Every structure is written in structure tokens, then in C-alpha cells.
Amino acid sequence: MEKVEAVTVSNVDPYRRILNKVVSQLLLDKGAGQASNHSLETLTQMLQALIWEIGNSAHNYCELSGRTMPTVGDVSLALINMGISISNLDPYMRKETHVPIPLPPQQTQQRPLSLLQAGIKAPHPHYVPSYFPPMPDPHAYIRTPTHKQPVTEYEAIREKAACQKRDIEKALTKFLCKTTETNNLFPTEDNMFPLIACKPAFPPYAAALNPTDQVFDFEELEYHYLVANRTEDEPSKDDGEEGDSENEEMDGDKSKEEKPELDIKPNSNTNKAILENPNIDNPYLRAATLPKRSKNCPTPGTMPSRSLATTAPTIRTPSTLEITKTNL
């Protein structure tokens, strides 16, 4: 038996290709060794139209009987209506020389490259058809919490509590050393090893609530009272005129030396501090001082003095009227 020549099918429909193979196999069974392309396409088209008509008629008989799925009886009625004998189908099926149609080669499905795939994709559930797209990657279902999980280990909790307690005690000690009186552990360095003075105050929270920028205690109030009531002697004024400017300088030096100082009795710690440190940082508590007068500037309220040696007698100049009268 001659082999049928290979025929190229231009159509890419897979069902059309299967029908083309069926027609070629039937031609081989009947002894046809060769077939042209046009005849093979014509026979394929005729077989396709026959199968379509059989299926359409069987569907109509099925709906006429009130059913949705056709049965063997519906197909038999469709064949009989088209004039095809059913009795010849049984011996044709039992024919031993029948050559089966080879199955189409199974093509290996190319797996899509999942470069960013994490994990194994979950299969479809039973109610999802297989032709649906695959499920997403497992990382798409990961739920990332936005907060940190609390630490529940016993050792970590105790260590954290101990660190917090140590930091609180250290900060409180530094705060008390800067705001209250302290004792020095060693006499060399004052700020190396400070100790909090054991002087309880009542109530203890009053020191923290009161402002500490300027504290007015009784000693400072006493000093403020002394400065406010302080009086200074005015410098002596000369009624007459002095002979020279040198005498003015000598008298000015004597008046400065004769100014009495403020008598402050060292009866308190504040007065001692005043005597030791006369310079006061607070400008409002500082004693008022008179501005220094220069050598050439006169004292306010007095006329400038003139020496007799330097002053010359004034000569009156005659007017033009007097000159004319004398000439006449």
C-alpha cells in the first residue's frame, strides 16, 4: 500500500487539523494512496458540515423532548432524518482491519518564567475551572503587621526594667545636684563626686514649682533695703572764684578723698559678701553714681570761673556820631 503524501494544511484551527487527519485515514482504509490538496480540503469541509448538521438535529430533538443534554436516541433520529443507515455502523465498528488514528503529539507547555515568584502557587479549588488563570504568588497574601510584637521573655523584661530604673535614678541625682545644695566627697574636685545634702524640705515639691532664676531670701532683701536707703554727700561747691586751673584740680582731688563711705556693719552673711564683693551683677540693685565731670566742663548750676590774670580790661570804641561832634 502506498503512503499518502504529506499535505500542508494552511488553517491553524486544531479541530480542522483533526478532521484532515480523519479524512486521510479513511482514504488509506479505502486504498487511496495519493490525494491532492484541493480534494482533501473538499472532503474535510464535507465531513465538517455533516458532523455539524448531525449535532444541530440532535440538539433540536433534545429540546423538543424537554431535555438539555442529547442522548443516543436523539443522535439516531438525526441520522435517520438525514438518510443515513444505522445498521451499517455496528459491523464497521467491529472491523478488525481498522487502523486507528494516531493521537496528536502532546506539546510540552512552556512554563512562564517567574523571576519574582516566592513559594509555590496554590492550586485552583474544585469550583474554579482549570482554564482560569493561576493563583497569585503566596507573598501576595502575606499580612505584615505595622507594629512590633511586645517582648515576653522574662530576662529581657527584667533587664529593660533595671536599665530604666538606673537611668531614672541617675537623671534624678544629676537634677538634684544642680538644683539643691551638695556635699563634696573629696575636697579637691567640686564637680567630680557630688553628694546630695541631707536637708529635707517641706513640702518637697515647692522647690521644683518655684522659679529659680532670681530667688529673694531675707538676706538679699536686707541688702536691697540698705542699697535703696543709701545716701551720699554732695560734693562741696566753692562760692568764690579760684585763681588758677591747678587749684581746681587740687580741690577736686580733695573732694574725692573726703567722700564718706557707706557704713555697713558686718552683722550678716550678706553684708560680709557685700564687703568682699562690692561689684554687683544685678543693675537694679547697684547703687546710683554721679557722672564724672571733666576738667574743662563747669559744674552744673555754677558759672564758669575766670582768672584775673587772663582777663583784660575792655576798651569802649567810639561811634561815628561821637567822632563828628568832637571835630566840630
Swiss-Prot record:
Name where it mostly resides: nucleus
Region: Disordered; residue ranges are: 229-309
Where composition is biased (Acidic residues), the residues are: 239-251
Tell where it localizes.
Nucleus
The UniProt keyword set, sorted, is: Nucleus, Phosphoprotein, Transcription, Transcription regulation
Q: Which SMART domains match?
A: BTP
Checking CDD domains in the record gives: HFD_TAF8 (cd22918), TAF8 (cd08049)
Gene Ontology terms: biological process:
transcription initiation at RNA polymerase II promoter
Name the job this protein performs.
TFIID is a multimeric protein complex that plays a central role in mediating promoter responses to various activators and repressors.
Instruction: Give the protein family.
Output: Belongs to the TAF8 family.
Oligomer and partners: Belongs to the TFIID complex which is composed of TATA binding protein (Tbp) and a number of TBP-associated factors (TAFs). Histone fold interacts with N-terminus of Taf10b.
Task: State what protein this is by name.
Answer: Transcription initiation factor TFIID subunit 8
